[in-house]
């Protein structure tokens, strides 16, 4: 049985600890607060020095914040395949993917260098999965990422022009570290669509990275954009500043996996 003095000391210590936990919550250090409470219930923790115990609390809070930040970045990217990752890419012989090239791109050095990626392949080749895998790799490096289909982007830009916020939208896209444009130039664009598309591509050039996912060879891109000389200039810069990945394959990935 503890002596009366020892009981008083324990009660005071508990009050101090609870006050500390309350302040941690008020400072939005909830993970640290929870871990501190767990330490209070762990008799073995007393074997550690104060610095060691404090270091554990800081590490746990830091890790939780990093994980939460990563989740927010991935969620805001709007990936259609949120579980895609480069580790799960299938390197079947018929796909002729360069494992070393993909591993190098997964380091995201190309983003730091403001380069682009072009992914080419037929319908069902796995372009969207590979695009999302590169996007999630970028998220893991805490780059901002946005996935969007080109038709949806053109609709967004058209609406922005009508509402008088076109410049604001363009400025927003200039801040995204990696913009993934899926279904790139599947069909010819109108004059206004061509103008809007070239505007956003030009605004991002040499400032940030873009991933273009397309069924068609870059040699045929220009004929789908109305703005002739300007289109040629912009597209030429895109192509010469990009890493190109061609996904081949005798069967589509959907057929391989039994997806209709």
Placement of each model-derived feature along the sequence:
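Interdomain "pre-motor" coupling segment immediately N-terminal to P-loop NTPase/helicase cores
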Residues: 30-82
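Residue-level preference for the first positions of well-ordered beta-strands
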Residues: 116-118, 178, 209-211
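Conserved P-loop
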Residues: 97-175
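Intrinsically disordered, low-complexity and often Lys/Arg-enriched segments
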Residues: 1-22, 255-260
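Conserved phosphate/pyrophosphate-binding and hydrolysis machinery centered on Walker-type P-loop NTPases
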Residues: 26, 43-48, 79, 91-95, ...
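Extended interfacial segments that mediate partner engagement and assembly in macromolecular machines
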Residues: 67-120
């Amino acid at each position: 049985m503890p002596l009366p003095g020892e009981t008083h000391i324990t009660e005071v210590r508990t009050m101090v600890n609870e006050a500390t936990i309350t302040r941690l919550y008020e400072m939005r250090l909830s993970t640290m607060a929870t871990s501190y409470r767990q330490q209070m219930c762990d008799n073995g923790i007393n074997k550690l020095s104060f610095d060691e115990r404090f270091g554990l609390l800081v590490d746990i809070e830091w890790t939780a914040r990093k994980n939460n930040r990563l989740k927010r970045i991935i969620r805001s990217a709007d990936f259609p395949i949120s579980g895609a990752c480069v580790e799960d890419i299938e390197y079947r012989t018929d796909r002729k993917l360069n494992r070393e090239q993909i591993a190098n791109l997964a380091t995201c050095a190309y983003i730091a260098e403001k380069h682009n990626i072009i992914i080419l392949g037929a319908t069902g080749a796995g372009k969207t999965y590979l695009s999302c895998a590169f996007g999630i790799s970028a998220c893991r490096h805490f780059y901002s990422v946005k996935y969007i289909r080109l038709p949806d982007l053109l609709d967004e830009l058209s609406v922005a022009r009508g509402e008088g916020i076109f410049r604001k939208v363009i400025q927003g896209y200039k801040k995204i570290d990696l913009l993934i444009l899926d279904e790139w130039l599947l069909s010819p664009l109108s004059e206004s669509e061509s103008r809007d598309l070239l505007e956003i591509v030009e605004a991002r050039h040499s400032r940030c990275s873009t991933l273009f996912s397309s069924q068609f060879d870059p040699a045929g891109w220009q004929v789908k954009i109305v703005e002739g000389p300007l289109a040629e200039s912009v597209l030429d810069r895109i192509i010469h500043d990009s890493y190109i990945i061609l996904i081949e394959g005798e069967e589509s990935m959907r057929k391989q996996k039994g997806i209709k």
